[in-house]
Amino acid sequence: MLAYPVSSKPIDYSKPTFIQPKLDGVRCVIQSECRGSSWVIKAYSRTGKEWKNINHILAELKPFFQKYPKVVLDGELYNHDLRDNFEKIISLVRKTKPTDEDRLEASKKTQFHCYDVIFEDKNVLYERRRGFLGDHLYYGYKTINIIDNQIVNSDEEAQLYHKINLEKGYEGSIVRTNDPYQCKRSHNLRKFKDFSDAEAKLTSWVEGKGKRIGTIGKFIAVDADGNEFGMPVMDKFEYLQKNFKKMQGWIGKTATFTYFERTKKGSYRHPLFKAIRDYE
């Protein structure tokens, strides 16, 4: 989810303000589309790529879209049990020609976590959109989840809920103001996050040392500003060993990585490879 940091602009807590967990999932918007005389339900990534291995989710939403064909659901493909295995979520949803086995596994492990809805009337405030989701999608679904929201009245209260979200294993928190939906990054969404995400192009790799010989120890990468840095790879040894050759082929691709903060000179503190950004 694209969002500015909480610190980017003061928040007016005298107006309705909400906080929710920030998921480390794959962005997904779901909508109903008219095809001739019938309607079909489709799911897309942030960049418009169609997700083709979540038929179980689309089937479960069919009655909802029959009743509300002109709304769009905004959320993420996620499973909190896989919160430490982002690559698994990606591998399940990115398949363009899923087999029956792929669909079966996805049906067991992939869920849609909805955090907003888009109406034809773009002036609808978040408090009403939140109420709509609670009324129509909160109960009776197996793979559809509505992101939990809490009303907060101060930065101290928001920080408290953020701490709780971290303790529950979420990657951070999102603060929402009571404003209309924006189809772009806006100050209506702010993020509390101890680590940040960024993207950089992989230019080379360095083999691991000691017990990590035969695996990628780190990638060398260059960000959009031309800063070159090392991007360590931390994953299970078995996975790294099995995919040693495959990962060497990632050179030239764009990767997502996490980092704690940036120095005054623009360097990254504690950067870690997260995933290849070719799934959206």
Identify the residue ranges that each predicted region occupies.
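Phosphate/adenylate-binding "loop-and-lid" substructures adjacent to NTP/NAD/dNTP-binding pockets
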Residues: M1-K9
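Covalent nucleotidyltransferase
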Residues: K9-Y141, Y279
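Classical nucleotidyltransferase
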Residues: F18-Q20, V26-G75, Q182-E280
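Short, structured patches in soluble enzyme cores that scaffold and shape functional sites
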Residues: G75-L77, C114-F119, D148-I151, T177-D179, ...
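Short helix-to-loop capping/linker segments positioned immediately adjacent to catalytic or ligand/cofactor-binding
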Residues: D100-L104, D121-N123, D148-N153, A158-N165, ...
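N-terminal, charged amphipathic alpha-helical interaction modules
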Residues: T143-I146
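Amphipathic alpha-helical
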Residues: D148-S196
